[in-house]
Amino acid sequence: MQPSSIVVAGLGVLVLLARPAAGSQASQPTAPQASPQSAAAVPDFPGFTVKLTFSDKASNTLLARKETVIVAAYLWGYPKPGTPKHLIDDIGQVDLGEVKSEVAPDKDADFGDFQLKKDPLQQVDSRGPQLLINVFSGRKSSPNNLLDCGIYEGLLKSAREANIKVACKLIGE
């Protein structure tokens, strides 16, 4: 195995098979693929949906500007005692990766079932993988984010039942 493969495996890259909502576009996982030896899959995690709501002004602006919305799902975990330092990020978490779904402002973001890589997941403590959802504009009509949105944070295993809703308005609204 090449040294770069070891580093990639240690980063806790997430292998996701995200299925976007009908009429939406999903970006591929943002991290590089690890070698087959370190990419051993663990049990599936069920997919989940993020329901987006917008203020009238935000909705009208996004539609008029033909702007998209990006829903970013960041996965992480609390490290077990003795977790190798190379698996712990600068804020003390095990990075399990991220996936993004780009949707029209009138669509929900659907994330399909996926698997996490075995190596980093084995270093997560008994609380299990955590999920953080952030939402921002797709920057099609402006180089800057246009949206001020809430977040969602919770257990990954509970995401399907959590009925995740994120409300957005325009920045400064």
What function would you assign to each model-found segment?
Residues 70-74, 132-134:
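Beta-strand signatures of extracellular beta-sandwich domains
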Residues 62-70, 126-128:
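Short coil-to-beta strand junction motifs in C2/discoidin
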Residues 26-48:
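Beta-strand-rich domain onsets/edges
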Residues 136-147:
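Short acidic/polar inter-strand loop motif in beta-rich domains
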Residues 1-9:
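Bacterial N-terminal signal peptides that target proteins for export
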Residues 51-62:
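Short amphipathic, basic-aromatic surface patches that mediate peripheral association
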Residues 150-173:
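Extracellular beta-sheet/turn segments enriched in Thr/Pro/Gly and aliphatic residues
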Residues 78-125:
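Tryptophan-paired
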